[in-house]
């Protein structure tokens, strides 16, 4: 014990000479206070981290809610048996950013997956996370018992029309949804199967996954149970391959962020391939099979790629249909353009005279994509390409106004940029 006291005395007081201590008698108290403050701050950080984790990560609540409703026969799905009976759908690392939207990495059928489910209604009903689930009273109330197959088809058609607009291909999408709902492949859709697919469709990401299912740049939907769903895991969930930890992002200045990103980013030819994939995705959603879609969070954190450096959208919840945005803007009061913003950056103009938002987004998807690609592609780019690449990206970033009114110009810029990049990496191992 005496040795321990000596060690503490040496650590706290030896850096200060005895002469200085005699001149500054309060220095010992200051050192003790600093030591106590360090312990207090460290304990507070640990406590806050634990509290934040326990608040955000409620995978056990998610499983409890879903499995309770599955065992009652209220819901169904292709992943229910593995989740609730055999427990081969395993929750692993918590990735949630909101307590009402649970996101976990996991493992299912010998592959890495992402598991997502919502617990909002349960938390609203009772602050105790272990209380009996009552969410089926709110979420799984449609269709009601006695609804015929034709009536359910009509429900689906009207829902898709309201969210995707008048599209000639909606009938095919309804058939695709009914096939997905028929989990046991008996050619019929039970009430539990219908309730599950109806709840699932009300999740923006699922609606977009089904609408963009034929596109190679979105995550594949692997299974569901009620409104819990499982998607493929994207190996690299950031444009730069890795992300700076959250607690460091606020501490480090933006120039340091840029240096870290450049250091972690793939080689330039691989970045060019990823960029081509992003441009192809922008092209696909510009006037797709099921209407137009808008990227409403153009952060590099929402763009990833797989082992082959093929572009992948990390989170389709950040993408919105044209009908969704128009519904948000319709009749909306505004004082300035920022009042007309859906998501992070889908902004329409504010009519200052009428004090209402206009219906059309100012900045098209392509301009947002080019803003992301400017730093991403120019750093380390081949010298014989840099000047022309910079020129085309600058032109691309100036795109604005109603995209449908400048479709030819939009397509020309996109194709020129794709061609420029593809010529540089074609006939190489990177292509």
Swiss-Prot record:
Disulfide bonds join 57-94, 62-117. The lineage of its organism: Eukaryota, Metazoa, Chordata, Craniata, Vertebrata. This is Divergent protein kinase domain 1B. It is a single-pass type II membrane protein. Residues 52-431 are lumenal. Its main location: endoplasmic reticulum. It comes from Xenopus tropicalis. Among the many cysteines in the lumenal domain, most are probably involved in disulfide bonds. SUPFAM superfamilies: EF-hand (SSF47473). Residues 1-30 are cytoplasmic. It comes from the Eukaryota. Signal peptide: none annotated. The chain crosses the membrane at residues 31-51. The keyword Membrane applies. A motif (May mediate ER retention) lies at residues 5-6. It is found in: Endoplasmic reticulum membrane. Belongs to the DIPK family. Keywords: Disulfide bond, Endoplasmic reticulum, Membrane, Signal-anchor, Transmembrane, Transmembrane helix. GO terms for cellular component: endoplasmic reticulum membrane.
């Amino acid at each position: 014990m005496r040795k321990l006291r000596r060690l503490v005395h040496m650590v706290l007081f030896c850096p200060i000479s005895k002469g200085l201590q005699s001149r500054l008698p309060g220095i010992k108290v200051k050192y003790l206070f600093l030591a106590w403050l360090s312990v207090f701050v460290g304990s507070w950080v640990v406590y806050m981290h634990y509290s934040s984790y326990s608040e955000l990560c409620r995978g056990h609540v998610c499983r409890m809610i879903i499995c309770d409703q599955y065992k009652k026969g209220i819901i169904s799905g292709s992943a229910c048996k593995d989740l609730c009976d055999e427990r081969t759908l395993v929750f692993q690392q918590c990735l949630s950013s909101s307590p009402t939207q649970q996101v976990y990495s996991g493992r299912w059928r010998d592959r890495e997956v992402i598991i997502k489910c919502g617990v909002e209604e349960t938390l609203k009903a009772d602050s105790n996370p272990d209380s009996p689930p009552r969410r089926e009273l709110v979420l799984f109330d449609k269709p009601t018992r006695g609804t015929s197959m034709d009536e359910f088809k009509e429900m689906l058609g009207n829902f898709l029309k309201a969210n995707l607009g008048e599209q000639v291909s909606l009938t095919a999408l309804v058939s695709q949804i009914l096939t997905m709902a028929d989990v046991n492949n008996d050619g019929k859709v039970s009430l539990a199967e219908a309730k599950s697919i109806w709840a699932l469709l009300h999740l923006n990401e699922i609606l977009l996954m089904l609408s963009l299912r034929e596109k190679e740049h979105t995550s594949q939907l692997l299974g569901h149970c009620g409104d819990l769903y499982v998607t493929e895991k994207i190996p690299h969930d950031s444009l730069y391959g890795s992300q700076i930890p959250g607690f460091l992002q606020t501490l480090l200045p933006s120039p340091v962020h840029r240096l870290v990103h450049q250091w972690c980013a793939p080689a330039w030819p691989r970045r060019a391939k990823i960029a081509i994939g992003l441009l192809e995705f922008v092209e696909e959603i510009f006037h797709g099979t099921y209407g137009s879609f808008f990227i409403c969070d153009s952060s590099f954190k929402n763009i990833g790629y797989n082992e082959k450096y093929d572009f992948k959208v990390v989170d389709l919840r950040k993408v919105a249909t044209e009908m969704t945005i128009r519904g948000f803007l319709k009749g909306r009061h505004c004082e300035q353009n920022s009042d007309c913003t859906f998501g992070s950056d889908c902004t329409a103009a504010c009519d200052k005279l009428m004090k209402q938002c206009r219906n059309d987004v100012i900045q098209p998807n392509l301009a947002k994509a080019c803003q992301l690609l400017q730093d991403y592609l120019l750093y380390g780019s081949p010298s014989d390409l840099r000047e022309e690449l910079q020129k085309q990206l600058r032109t691309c970033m100036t795109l604005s106004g109603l995209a449908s009114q400048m479709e030819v110009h939009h397509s020309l810029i996109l194709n020129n940029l794709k061609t420029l990049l593809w010529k540089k990496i074609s006939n190489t191992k990177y292509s």
